[in-house]
Amino acid sequence: MKKLILFYLPDCNVSKLFEERLYKALALPEFAGRFNLIRHNLYTDTGRQEARSVGISDAPTAYCNGDILRGVQSDYIIRKYLRKLLGQS
């Protein structure tokens, strides 16, 4: 199972939209159960430290094995990103 890390700002509408689209994609049979989603709030010390360790300074961002998806993307782009991650095995 791949670890997909979500860095977000909980009070931000952009982060909420990004997270909603990501969860919608992860619910598809193609991706269901294939990712372990870890959430880091960038308002916390732990979240900021984790983000810095992988070179991320903005939110919302999804990160997995060196691949980064930044900002609000279409459902298609999110699915394309997840397929790319699964193809890396």
What are these regions (language model features)?
Residues M1-F31:
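Local sequence-structure signature of Cys/Sec-based thiol-disulfide redox active-site neighborhoods
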Residues F7-L9, F31-G47:
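Thiol-based oxidoreductase modules, predominantly thioredoxin-like and allied folds used
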Residues N13, T46, Y76:
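Short alpha-helical
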Residues L17-E20, Q49, Q73:
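Generic recognition of short, well-ordered alpha-helical segments
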Residues R21-Y23, A27-L28, I56, D75, ...:
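Cysteine-centric redox/oxidoreductase cores and disulfide-bonded domains
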Residues R52-C64:
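Structural micro-motif
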Residues Y63-S89:
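Non-catalytic, surface beta->alpha helical segment in thiol-disulfide oxidoreductase systems
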